[in-house]
């Protein structure tokens, strides 16, 4: 069980880093420049939430759920982190100086969660062997 707990360290660290980045006061950001033209902020949100979902799915898969339950857990995680992103927009609006609510950030968070879900599903669920999924029989283990 101790080994399984170690798999939760990277996603917990990423959660702490992400929360810190999402709660930086708006005065700490540079003023408008060429980065606004390429929507760098949205790409950062996509990447941040893609990594969030991927890391949490990677940790959850170590808990040895069968394929169906694992897929449901992955979907739950994607929805959870999308809700977290939406909640952080409200935190930014009401509690962080010089930050505001941006529907574009919520959309970027959702896209990142979907990309993380698809990648995690393809990487972790599709590669499960019959023994790992708990449906091992004599015929498929030979």
Name these PLM-found stretches.
Residues 1-104, 110-132, 136-142:
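Bulky hydrophobic segments
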